[in-house]
Amino acid sequence: MRQLTLVLAALVCLAGEPAGQSAQPADPVAALLGRIEAALLDSNPDRYMALLSSLADRESAALFAEGMASPGLTRVVIRERDRVELAGTLPGEGYRLLVEVLRETGQRATLNTWRLDVRRRGSDALDWGVVSQELLTTLRGLYRLTLNTRHQFTARDLVVVSEDVKLTVPEATVFTAETENGPTAYVILGRGDMTFSPAPKGERTQLRVISGAEVLQTPFDGTFVRVHPATASSRITAREMVERPVDPRDLKRAEEMFRHEAAKSFGLDLGDLSADSWSLLPLPGDLLAEIRTRRFETLTYTKSSNEVEDVTLFDRRQRRNLSVYSSRDHLARYGRSYHEDEESEYAVRWYDVNVIYNPARRLLQGQTRLAIETTASSANTLKIRLADPLVVESIVSPEFGRLLSVRVRRQNTIVINLPTTVIKGYRLELVVTYSGTLEPQEIDRESVAVSAPQVPEQPTEEEVPLEESYLFSNRSYWYAQALTLGYAPARITVTVPEPWSVIASGEFESVAPPPGPAPRGPRLRQFTFVASQPVRYLAFLVGRFTEPRVETLSLKHIEESLLASRQPGVYYDELTLRVQTNPRQRQRGREVLRTTVNIVRFYTSLVGDFPYSALSVGVVERRLPGGHSPPYLSMVATPGPGSTLRWGDDPAALPNFPDFFAAHELAHQWWGQAVGWKNYHEHWLSEGFAQYFAALWAERSLGRGVFGSIIRSMQQWSVQESDQGPVYLGYRIGHFKGDSRLFRAVIYNKGAMVLHMLRRLVGDEAFFAGIRRYYNTWRFAKAGTDDFRRAVEAESGMDLGRFFERWIYGDTLPQVTFTSRLEQKDGADLAVLRFEQSGEIFDFAVTVTFEYPDNSTTSTVVKVTDRVVEARVPVKGRPRRIDANRDQATVGVFR
């Protein structure tokens, strides 16, 4: 049962109302449960035995009663959660019950799930007994923590330590909350100093960006600390700690801190089982500290061993992470490029999602069927993701029947209790039914959108209200799903009232009235989509869309050499394209379809494949341009008529490229969807690739001049914002500042520039062959930077370890001194080009431009892979000027 304790070591609460609960006095089953409560509270197994049916196995019942009616119980609560007819009995004569049982012993408690078979014992309709009983799950180690008001301590030179953090308090007042094995919570009052010194270089950069220094040092006035009693002595020490009489003023301050801070972590809200606050213990070696600083208000430090990135510093006021990384032990265990599925309990093999959405009320009713296969060595709980506003009505498994669940507060997570432990490879289905009010998703960081101007602008009278549309995608958690985004085929059915239409992940299958009698009110239409290929996540878009423009695109133009390199799998010779627009964008439909056809054909020629059989494009209106690209679906947002907003000062606004958003979003069908990323650090493998492929389309469709201006723009943003952190920080670039432009500058533009510089270093043939090898190897799987590096190394024969170490994992730029001189050799004019790097050595190729007196220019590319590189290049006469990186195709500082 230890696993159940681990997965619930967070703030959780019971999901939903008790199913099947009937507390009316006339209910004989409720009366029987009340008698069982009394028998357990009396710690009297014999009283339980007296409640058995004559058909019961008394030996197994006696063992059960001995375990449940343990000595010292101070409170017992039994709540019925489910009731079905008992096989072999007449209707109303017997039931199989699922019940939850809370057994308290003083300040400790145990939570159990039982299965009880009960039936009427004789002619008396109110006389029922227990036929059989089974203990399904147990959650031990619940504590009703209270501050010890009888003891106060004075400590000198008190120190709290954990990985990379140290809190020191010269003179401290200490109160504790204890378990039977010692204190687990400490309230520490007194002025002290906090030092947080993260080991990873990227985390130190983040601290410098946020606080101005790579080590965070800040005074604080008090802290609340949670530890496991067994390891408390190694985490909290003092030169001297003595008890003193309780000071009412100190106690009042301590109680205020305890009341405010204790409920934030490790807490259970047991709903109708108990109105009290219950807490789990941190795992041995873990630590949580709520630190009341003067500069940041409350900072939360956690060392949580059940997370891959187990060290976190969190700003409660801003609700943003300052630092998140793996401890030294976890780094050695999981590596830098860890897989986010590392600790997953299961993999989803198939989804069937059926929802009804009412745009006017924002009401969503849904049912998700998940076919899953366990991947953990053993499991008696499973966790799923579902938006907090959606109330779970039931979770049923054909294998186990109705299942009990608890919801993790404010984390969009539900923990499901299995009635038995299952081993690796076990297959089962979950059917999750839910409903609630759910707001649509804004365009977010797995999409592209420019930021609003820094000076707020109000809509003018000339602006026309936007055509409404509603997106539910990867951040909406609108369907029950695994905690991490895996790959699985799916079927989606979405029902909406007329005149609304739906575009969704998958190939369009049908639209028809829903089965059954027609409801009163607006007519309903049911849209069905099937994703035969595995997808990372599902999405749907609701709008008043025009009838689709449909075109079938042949994919037979792919070169034979590219077909030969494919891995085994399902591939398509043609693609069905569907374009739908808001009514005001109707005239754009033909243009969007033509552009989409050309872009898809171009990208397919580079990669050698389009991953899906169909693609739907939805053109919608937003105040600012942007887009989002789930599998099988690309949404392009355009400003509405009369929009006066300007967005030129944004990394996503590439110059002279009107098709940018469409090109970027379409590229995500390959990069981000067909090939995913292992964890959030690898986000550049989606956004950087999509950004660079969009630039390649600009080169193909608009020419080298536009491509060059795009490269210069991306280079300038990269140089300007590289000090915000390495590409490998992913979403956290700009996160604390709340400035998404920084994220796009580094992840989108610098990520794209890394690809451009890699292409120039290894050459076009090796670069695009590496792209195809990478795609073919990781099609419908999640990859990391090292996987891409190995693919390009295999095609180029070059060692690219340092290249990626500097450009992806580092946050510095090459500092290059460039000099040139002219000389003659054997009658030929030569330019001697010298590059000297100071600081860290980078690998790159750089353009050297020769400008002659007649204003003509020539150029050459020099590969710089050492601290000092000299190259001799023939020139025609005497150039009047020689420049390095005039085309700004290399990110760096050249002098």
Where are these regions (language model features)?
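Hydrophobic alpha-helical and helix-loop surface patches within well-folded domains
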Residues: 529, 556-574, 579-834
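Bacterial N-terminal signal peptides
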Residues: 5-15
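Non-catalytic accessory/interaction domains
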Residues: 283-284, 290-332, 337, 343, ...
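Exposed beta-sheet edge and beta->alpha loop/turn motif
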Residues: 86-142
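Hydrophobic helix-coil surface modules that form long, contiguous segments used
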Residues: 329-335, 341-367, 373-378, 388, ...
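A surface-exposed beta-strand-loop module
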Residues: 140-251, 257, 267, 306, ...
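Extended, low-hydrophobicity, Ser/Thr/Pro/Gly-biased non-transmembrane segments
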Residues: 221, 230-345, 431-548, 555, ...
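Short solvent-exposed beta->alpha transition segments
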Residues: 24-38, 45-107, 786-790, 794, ...
